Design a protein with these regions (language model features):
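Short glycine/serine-rich loop segments
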Residues: 99, 103-225, 437-441, 451-453
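Alpha-helix-centered segments that form part of catalytic cores
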Residues: 412-438
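Acidic/His- and Gly-rich active-site-bordering loop/insert found
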Residues: 50-52, 57-130
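Short helix-loop capping/hinge segments that flank enzyme active sites or metal/cofactor-binding pockets
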Residues: 64-85, 252, 309-365, 381, ...
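An N-terminal boundary/leader segment
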Residues: 1-44, 49, 482
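Gly/Ser-rich, acidic/histidine-flanked active-site/gating loops
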Residues: 233-306, 331-334, 338
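A short helix-breaking turn/cap at a secondary-structure junction
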Residues: 186-271, 480-482
């Protein structure tokens, strides 16, 4: 029954000696062993070490002292633990140092019990690596739980753990939260610790945080891990707020049902937003259907260009470490194509792309001067089936020949093969490239019995607005969490 509670309640039980850290950790291990066979959410455990750390957990003043947590098996390194990044290339790799974000979790009192499933290098919006296999959805295991923090979402939605560490470089916290009926906050760029393994993940698009079941957990965790980190390339001032303060009703909310890349949006996704709009109007908010004037298609092409180039650098570093050239069989086909596409991008094109990001951030900031919130569906549809293939065989054949193409043809091919999966999740990426905070709230269940979230975006540094908006929905019984 312990894992029915959120992390705040488990921490309170530990503080008041009604539960020991060891009991909390043992309960989480028991839940994982019972449920993981069906869901494939967790890919490694550190039982002996976690139980030893739980026994030594005596400083109960820390906000999450003794609470068990999973790290994501991608870019959240703990010294001595697996460092696979979801890739067969690194199936035996171990982390040689601990990341600052992981240290922040430990300093908040969490006991790290293992790692959650993630797709290879986090490139996809479902979790389906050849190394680990698919992470399945607790609402219906025939469906995906999303990606790239799919294992984290499966583990939290199935109550293996009260919350799980995650990261978001294009929606990888918010997409799984939408697909599994959870809360997914992507903080402002520079809000949470980075390094030393990576300092500017995808030029600052990627940020670490967590997938959660309660707004109070989300707020307390943000307060616990936020930082101003002098060596980091991006900083944002520390946030101080009281979650009990009401959200002023004179805040304007803009909403849109349109895909930024002109793809189809399901009726379920539209209904999720319109229901939220009705609720907000009842609460006295001023609502307007409008959107920032942005070229969504160009922005997503710019987003993929960063993925291409940053990945090419990563693979070049891997080649140097391995002292050999990487081959197509070393990795999954998507990873190979992204790597190949990034090899020959001109520096002028890359610089122009970053300027486009900055201009988009300027446009969004001006838009959020007038409207405190921008509301959209989080995802354009509910979770896809595990049997669904986003990339068909003829496209795969084309991808296998990517090295024969010109530089422009390669980047065009990346956009082309990602389009079917992008169409399912086109709403999340812009907040990453602009640096804004965004939250997915679990407010809707579609007629197929699967959940779907709505997304609120706010000005940089204003996670407090997003959390108070989340609390408004939560305390009025609008959340649909299993």
């Amino acid at each position: 029954f312990v894992m029915e509670f959120d992390a705040t309640e488990i921490a309170n039980l530990i503080k008041t000696k009604q539960l020991s850290p060891k009991e909390a950790v043992m309960t989480a291990f028991s839940e994982i062993k019972t449920k993981n066979g069906q869901l494939n959410a967790v890919v490694s455990l550190r039982e002996e070490k976690a139980l030893e750390e739980a026994k030594r957990c005596v400083d109960l003043a820390r906000p999450f002292a003794g609470v068990p947590i999973l790290l994501k098996s991608l870019g959240q390194y703990l010294e001595g633990e697996p460092a696979t990044d979801g890739s067969k290339l690194f199936k035996d790799a171990k982390a040689t140092q601990t990341d600052n974000f992981v240290k922040a979790l430990q300093q908040a009192g969490f006991i790290i019990i293992g790692q959650s499933n993630a797709p290879e290098f986090g490139f996809t919006n479902v979790t389906d690596s050849k190394l680990y296999g698919p992470a399945r959805n607790p609402w219906n295991p025939e469906f995906y739980s999303g990606g790239s923090s799919g294992g984290a979402a499966s583990a939290v939605a199935s109550k293996m753990v009260p919350l799980a560490a995650a990261s978001d470089g294009g929606g990888s916290i918010r997409i799984p939260a939408s697909f599994t009926g959870l809360i997914g906050l992507k903080p402002t760029r520079g809000r949470t610790p980075v390094g030393p393994s990576s300092w500017r993940g995808w030029q600052g698009a990627s940020v670490s945080f967590a997938i959660t079941r309660s707004i109070r957990d989300t707020a307390s965790l943000l307060a616990a891990v936020q930082t101003v980190q002098p060596p980091a390339p991006f900083q944002t001032p520390l946030l101080s707020f009281n979650l009990e303060d009401q959200l002023p009703k004179n805040r304007k909310v803009a909403f849109s049902l349109n895909s930024p890349v002109q793809t189809k949006v399901s009726e379920a996704a539209k209904q999720a937003v319109l229901s939220a709009v009705n609720f907000l109007e009842e609460q006295g908010f001023e609502i307007e259907e409008t959107e920032p004037k942005l070229d969504g298609t160009q922005l997503i092409k710019d987003y993929y260009l960063v993925n291409d180039v940053e990945s090419a650098v990563m693979f070049s570093n891997i080649e140097n470490a391995l002292e050999r050239k990487l081959k197509i069989d070393d990795m999954e086909l998507i990873s190979w194509c992204i790597c190949q596409a990034g090899m020959d991008v001109k520096a002028t094109d890359y610089s122009r792309m970053l300027a486009n990001w900055d201009q988009a951030a300027f446009v969004m900031d001006a838009f959020l001067e007038k409207y405190s919130f921008f509301l959209t569906p989080t995802t354009a549809q509910t979770a896809p089936e595990v049997s669904h293939q986003f990339i068909n065989e003829s496209m795969r054949a084309k991808m296998r020949r990517i090295s024969e193409l010109s530089s422009r043809e390669r980047t065009d091919l990346v956009y082309e093969f990602f389009m079917p999966s992008l169409a399912a999740t086109p709403f999340t990426q812009q907040a990453n490239l602009m640096g804004n905070p965004a939250i997915s709230l679990p407010v809707h269940v579609a007629s197929n019995g699967l959940p779907l979230g709505v997304q609120f975006v706010a000005k940089k540094g204003r996670e407090d607005l997003l959390l108070k908006m989340g609390k408004l929905f939560e305390q009025n019984g609008k959340f649909r969490i299993i």
